[in-house]
A protein has these predicted regions:
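Active-site groove signature of glycoside hydrolases
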Residues: 101, 136-150
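Long, acidic (Asp/Glu-rich), low-complexity accessory segments flanking structured domains
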Residues: 1-90, 103-135, 139, 157, ...
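Conserved, mostly hydrophobic/aromatic
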Residues: 87, 98, 142, 191, ...
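Active-site-adjacent pocket scaffolds in enzyme catalytic domains
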Residues: 156-248
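Active-site cleft segment of glycoside hydrolase catalytic domains centered on the general acid/base Glu
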Residues: 148, 153-158
Length: 342
């Protein structure tokens, strides 16, 4: 298949626009979508303090020996090495954004993973908005979470900024987004916001997206955990399966010269082999978003995108249930009001 061969070339900047017609009316949460875990960790500030939410032992050691703890945390907390626009070009469409207020950062908001980032929230979201302008048929999911030290005022200002920045590109949480419906409406952005009060105030924001992760450094345990979750049944709507490995503070302090990249690369072949055996869809074991660390060092994105072609081969020829005449008469836009996800 020509489109599949194109995916082998490395970059996937417009992969959604190339998907077969059979997938255009499938809810986005039934497609396989590549995502990056801790998407902003490529720009951690090694001079910033450890987060207040980190274990007390780590914070105490950081106060006493910052020149030792911070480089150590930097090596273990860095899980990506590409800027957001490059991640988009690779094919990433889900962004795990962990937002925080830096102690000495004034009113600006940053991101955090162990320590804080150099790039602000406004700078990062602006980069995504610029990229979307040149890729009008690509749809991204921005998952905002954690909100370390944010005040109510911070939340209000952040939500207002997101809505003003993306405007009509935002998919309403009251809809069931598909590629076709988003294209017809000019929508390109799903924003989940892990604060229920803000979600209730803004229909443009979606509730927090479930993220399955094993909290283990052993890839076999990660796979076993994800398999167990699959057997329990997938959530309705969007959800994430995390291939990311996790180390605790004690291990990090005892291995200051190692890093997450080495650990990830060692496990990647096993994790990607499991990923290649999955299939997207609304069934009990159906995959949706799959997140990984260091998304630029393997064929991760292309592998996940190809799972959608597996879905086409497994499905009946006719996917769209809307009569042809009806679809044409309304200019290809169906009613996708939320009801019973498929």
């Amino acid at each position: 298949m020509e489109d599949e061969e194109r995916l082998q070339l490395g970059g996937n900047p417009d992969w959604m626009s190339l998907l077969p017609a059979e997938l255009l009316d499938v809810p986005l949460w039934n497609l396989a979508i590549p995502g990056s875990h801790d998407s902003m960790s490529f720009c951690l500030d090694v001079s910033s303090p450890v987060l207040k939410s980190e274990p007390r032992l780590l914070r105490v050691i950081d106060m006493l020996f910052p020149c030792w703890t911070r480089p150590c945390i930097y090596r273990w907390a860095t899980t990506q090495q590409s800027v957001l626009s490059d991640q988009c070009d690779l094919g990433i469409r889900f962004f795990d954004l962990r937002i925080a207020r830096k102690p000495a950062g004034g009113r600006k908001l940053f991101f955090a993973h162990g320590i804080y980032t150099l790039i602000t929230v406004k700078e990062a979201l602006g980069e995504l908005a610029t990229w979307l302008d040149t890729h009008p048929k690509e749809i991204i999911i921005i998952a905002c979470s954690h909100f370390e030290s944010l005040t109510d005022e911070d939340h209000c200002q952040l939500a207002d900024y997101i809505i003003s920045l993306f405007g009509k590109k935002l998919c309403s949480s009251e809809d069931i987004p598909t590629l076709r419906s988003c294209w017809c409406r000019g929508q390109q952005v799903v924003v989940s916001y892990d604060d229920q009060q803000m979600v209730l105030q803004h229909p443009e924001l979606w509730t927090g997206i479930p993220y399955w992760y094993a909290d283990s450094s052993d890839p076999k345990k990660v796979i076993a955990y994800l398999e167990e979750q699959k057997h329990r049944g997938r959530p309705d709507g969007f959800y994430v399966s995390g291939l990311n490995l996790t180390e605790d503070a004690a291990y990090i302090l005892l291995h200051p010269l190692q890093d997450m990249r080495t650990l990830t690369l060692r496990a990647l072949s096993l994790l990607l082999r499991w990923a290649s055996e999955q299939q997207p869809g609304g069934g009990a074991g159906g995959l949706n978003v799959l997140c990984c660390d260091f998304v630029d060092v393997s064929h991760f994105c292309s592998l996940v995108i190809r799972l959608n072609y597996k879905k086409v081969l497994a499905a009946p020829r006719a996917v769209c249930t809307v009569p042809r005449a009806t679809a044409e008469s309304i200019g290809c836009c169906h009613s996708n009001q939320a009801g019973h996800p498929t």
